[in-house]
Amino acid sequence: MTDEDYPTDDPAVVTCGLPYPTGDLHIGHLRTYVSGDAFSRALRKLGQETVFVSGTDMHGTPIAVQAIEAGVGPLDLGLERHEQYADTFEEFSVAFDTYGHTDEETNVELTREFVGAWEDNDHVYETEIQVAYDPDADQWLPDRYVEGTCPYCGEHARGDECDEGCQRHLEPGEIEAPVSTITGNSAEYHERAHKFLRLSDFQEYLEGFINRMEGTNNAKNQPREWIEGGLEDFCITRDLDWGIDYPGEGGDDLVLYVWVDAPIEYVAATKQYSERVGTEEFDWASVWKDGDGEIIHVIGRDIIQHHTVFWPSMLAGADYAEPRAVCATGFVNIDGRGLSTSKNRAIWAAEYLDAGFHPDLLRYYLATASGFERDVNFSWAEFAQRVNTELADAVGNFAYRALLFANRNFDGTPQEVSLTDDVETEIAQAMDDYEDALNEYDLRTAGERAVALARFGNEYIQHNEPWNLDSEAAAPVMRDCVQLVKAVAVLLQPFLPEKTETLWAQLGEDGRVSDATIADCLQAPPAEFGEPAELFEKIEDDRVTELDEALAAKIEAASSEDADGEGMADETADDGIELEPLAEDDISFEEFQALDLRVGEVVEAEGIEGADDLARLEVDIGHEVRQIVAGIKQLHDLDALPGTRVVVVANMEPSELFGVESNGMVLAAGEDADLLTTHEDSEPGTKVM
């Protein structure tokens, strides 16, 4: 691993978090995989040798529980879903170099080697712990076989993770008020011998690693409290029939915890790729063992702890190389509300395709709607608006009018004229901005820069009006325009892989745009090409209305089913809220204007010692960074707040709470202190009207 900018001389391995084979894929899943794919393609554009891998997470309690319910074996169910996922990824042009699964022999053998190395290096020990047990079912209750209350934040939690609250990993025996998911009865805690990875051995290492690690701010900031607060050792075994048997002594009736073998699949998938192409072409060991490579993990933000605490320790304990970067994507909301599979407030991958839209349109939307770490809001109206204005009007309109005019008047690219200095400078600047954005792990800006180049082209052709010029005067204008189209095709390829191949062919280029690098943006286009076709169709308002009505109908159907007692409990239920009555006294517009509401960005968040509910926030409001006290300590994961855009009352009188001065107020809704955020990315300091 180096600290040089991309592209480096060493190869890169980009990974995506492994999906559990427990249900169909929706756009919340696709956001991570599309982002990982687009980033991999973009690195290749820079000339960075890149391998892109992932796989299906076959083991653990989620698949075991579903297999029992379906009356099939977990392997059969897992393999069926694995094939479905592979097909879906292919449909959306998520092109893994290897997409394996954790039950393959390569991963099983590597996992055994990892555990053996930990034992050889004295990082593993056995101890008695409290484990949940269901006396009625006569069964141990690992992970998702038990639910209860998170001991850290008090939210409802699964046995191994506080998925609804603070997102912490939970060790066996930690969950309070345990309930068996098998019988619904209260569980008991019994002592049981289990194996632990001694994370405390890696305390000093992790403190250094988290400072070296690149990636998104949430991935870099969230683990600091866990690491700096002292690490608890990691239970690596479970009482379960499904999984990889513990390979060492004293673990005959135990399997490895799913979060042991799951990330090792990154290594296994890379090794499988290396074996397929030959080690002379790509040597997996030089990257993963020798450190001669750039390892980049693209994950959902709910598994940050696993990838910034557990996984680096696992690698270090087996003498493997560390990751260079962890990029954690935010969630996807639907119409401004949390995606909920049980309420069917979701857009499923198959449902999107059935609606007749090209996969590239959703790829572009998900990869460029916000920065990596921020939540994306999906609505059919916003989807249509972005397709129509950014793709159809900006990219498609420019490409079509430029290539059509060039074809009809010059049979292709005008010859005997050179690219003008101004346009060459504009393209070169776009290339530099694109490269800078990727080195900041900023896909959104990279995509925006490509679309901005198309907008520049539209303005350029409109300003120069080649249709009003004679052939000699029009030639340099169209030479510039065709070059701009080529540059746009190259830069947008990571986001629109199929559509840009079509555009590349319309340009008369040989080969594929996927093989082009950023340097090709300034290489002369072919002298001849045919008449183009339009790349994008606009989405009409009537179609948006149809889609909105269909979404509302399926949500209503799921709600009715739930009311009848047939649906699942919803983790994001929002029914039955008792609203506060509206204020009886009106205020004047002048009174409202007295409030100075500003967009702010949380820079730092920490609990106030001695206060149950109060947190100290450092909030950037554009003009300055303000210290603000907010009653959100128990209601939000403070480590995840940096980078969040909030609305601040900037002209509140200063006050002092628990000895801490507060210079403003952060607006939040309801008893859960739901922080008010901006729909788009308004800059800190923007006035809220």
From Swiss-Prot:
The keyword Nucleotide-binding applies. It is found in: Cytoplasm. ATP binds at T341. Keywords: Aminoacyl-tRNA synthetase, ATP-binding, Cytoplasm, Ligase, Metal-binding, Nucleotide-binding, Protein biosynthesis, RNA-binding, tRNA-binding, Zinc. One of its GO terms (molecular function) is tRNA binding. It catalyses: tRNA(Met) + L-methionine + ATP = L-methionyl-tRNA(Met) + AMP + diphosphate. GO terms for cellular component: aminoacyl-tRNA synthetase multienzyme complex; cytosol. It comes from the Archaea. Its EC number is 6.1.1.10. Gene3D superfamilies: HUPs (3.40.50.620), Isoleucyl-tRNA Synthetase, Domain 1 (1.10.730.10), Methionyl-tRNA synthetase, Zn-domain (2.20.28.20), Nucleic acid-binding proteins (2.40.50.140). Binds 1 zinc ion per subunit. A motif ('HIGH' region) lies at residues 19-29. A motif ('KMSKS' region) lies at residues 338-342. InterPro entries: aa-tRNA-synth_I_CS, Anticodon_Met, Met-tRNA-synth_bsu_C, Met-tRNA_ligase_1, Met-tRNA_synth, Methionyl/Leucyl_tRNA_Synth, MetRS_core, MetRS_Zn. Zn(2+) binds at C150, C153, C162, C166. Its cofactor is Zn(2+). It holds the Pfam family tRNA_bind. SUPFAM superfamilies: Anticodon-binding domain of a subclass of class I aminoacyl-tRNA synthetases (SSF47323), Methionyl-tRNA synthetase (MetRS), Zn-domain (SSF57770), Nucleic acid-binding proteins (SSF50249), Nucleotidylyl transferase (SSF52374). Is required not only for elongation of protein synthesis but also for the initiation of all mRNA translation through initiator tRNA(fMet) aminoacylation. Homodimer. Belongs to the class-I aminoacyl-tRNA synthetase family. MetG type 1 subfamily. HAMAP family: Met_tRNA_synth_type1. PANTHER family: METHIONINE--TRNA LIGASE, METHIONINE--TRNA LIGASE, CYTOPLASMIC. This is Methionine--tRNA ligase. It comes from Halobacterium salinarum (strain ATCC 700922 / JCM 11081 / NRC-1).
